[in-house]
Each structure stands twice: as C-alpha cells, then as structure tokens.
Amino acid sequence: MTDSHAALLEALGVALPAELLTIALTHRSYSYENGGLPTNERLEFLGDAVLGLTITEELYHRHPDRAEGDLAKLRASIVNTQALADVGRGLTDEGLGAHLFLGKGEENSGGADKSSILADGVESLLGAIYLEHGLTVVREVILRLFGELLDTAPTLGAGLDWKSSLQELTAARGLGAPAYVVTSTGPDHDKEFSATVVIGEAEYGHGVGRTKKEAELKAAASAYKTLDES
C-alpha cells in the first residue's frame, strides 16, 4: 500500500485490506486498458444503498415532524453527484481523484476531477467499508463525512426545490420563465451533463451532473442565488 493510500484511509478513519481498497479505487477505464481487472462498480452499487439507508434513517430521526415529501427532498440535497464529488474532493490534500486508478484517456481528459467519477469513487469506498467493517462503522464514517450537509440541508429553504423556486422568483420580478440549455460529454456509459439557465437573453447559472435533471437542478440553484443576491 502506498503512502498516499495510507493518507486516504486515515481521512476515512478506517483500515481496509490492500486488495479491497485497490478494487474500490479502480475505474472501469483503467480496467479496459489493463486486461479486464475488477472495477469498483459492484462496490459502488453496494455503497449507494448503504449511503441512502444511512442518510434516510438519520433524516427520519432528526426531523420527526417533516412529511415524507420533504424528507425525500432533503435526502436529494445530500445524496447527489455534486455533493458526493465535493466530499471526495475533501478527502486528503490531493482529493480522492489523485488516488483513483484511471485509464490514460480518462486521466488525460480530466477524469480525476470529474464529478461523476468522484461520486462513484466515494460510493465504492463506502461499499468497501461496509463489507469489511459492517453497518455500524460505515454509518459512523458517513455521518462524519456528510455531517455538514446533514446540518445545513434543512436551512436551504428554496433548495428543496430549486427549479420551482427559481420560476416563482423570476415570475415575481417579471423576468419571464427560465430556460435550460443542456449539453453532454463523454461516452454513453459515463456521460456528464452540463446545464445553463437562460432568462431573457442572459445566463444566470450553471450546473453539472450525472443526469440531465441533476444538472438542471444545480443550474437552477446557482441562478436562484445569483438573482436573490442582486
């Protein structure tokens, strides 16, 4: 295990076997270029479920008076590609991207800082921690890594539904309905979407996500904050 991997495990606060950690950090692009090595996709699948359960349970207990719909929106503001990627960027001084095994093409195109890849990497690490240590330990890791998001999500207000809130704000100011211009990059199996909010003829916000919907929500959030502060 390298010193950089030791730093990553220190940031996570757990120990993992070298083989399991390697799988958790192996992106499919690296596997394709190196004879079909095991990738982190199965661990990502597992980690996604563990993360969703942990955040859902925590929100359920923290907010006993909130309706199911509000809890779902709170969870969506925490468990999404951008939030996961930001958590990944905060792991070690270099960020998670520096520890991932990426194919040369992906690495040369900036894959180490691509939100979708970082988000998948965080989930795969959580899956590995669950396999090695069980639910109690991975829950502790998740609550530490996502603690700030759990604390701030209820204070976002409009953030529970950025697109609707933006539309209400632009209508109140007589600016007309916001439009969303969406583009995508990357292969079909690993697309990243970019959305820009246009109101009138001016651009007000930009967002990136693993899906078109997520990119639009991020762009709406950015546009809302820009307008709200002007």
Curated annotation (Swiss-Prot):
Record's keyword terms, sorted: Cytoplasm, Endonuclease, Hydrolase, Magnesium, Metal-binding, mRNA processing, Nuclease, RNA-binding, rRNA processing, rRNA-binding, tRNA processing
Quaternary structure, from the entry: Homodimer.
Official protein name in the record: Ribonuclease 3
Domain of life: Bacteria
Pfam families linked: dsrm, Ribonucleas_3_3
Function: Digests double-stranded RNA. Involved in the processing of primary rRNA transcript to yield the immediate precursors to the all rRNAs (23S, 16S and 5S). Processes some mRNAs, and tRNAs when they are encoded in the rRNA operon. Processes pre-crRNA and tracrRNA of type II CRISPR loci if present in the organism.
UniProt cross-references to PANTHER family, sorted A to Z: RIBONUCLEASE 3, RIBONUCLEASE III
Essential cofactor(s): Mg(2+)
Gene Ontology process terms (BP): mRNA processing; regulation of gene expression; rRNA processing; tRNA processing
The reaction(s) this protein catalyses: Endonucleolytic cleavage to 5'-phosphomonoester
Residues engaged in binding Mg(2+): E44, D120, E123
EC number: 3.1.26.3
Domain DRBM: 161-229
A GO cellular component annotation in the UniProt record: cytoplasm
GO molecular-function terms, A-Z: double-stranded RNA binding; metal ion binding; ribonuclease III activity; rRNA binding
Similarity section: Belongs to the ribonuclease III family.
Principal cellular location given in the protein's record: cytoplasm
Every RNase III domain range: 19-134
Active site: D48
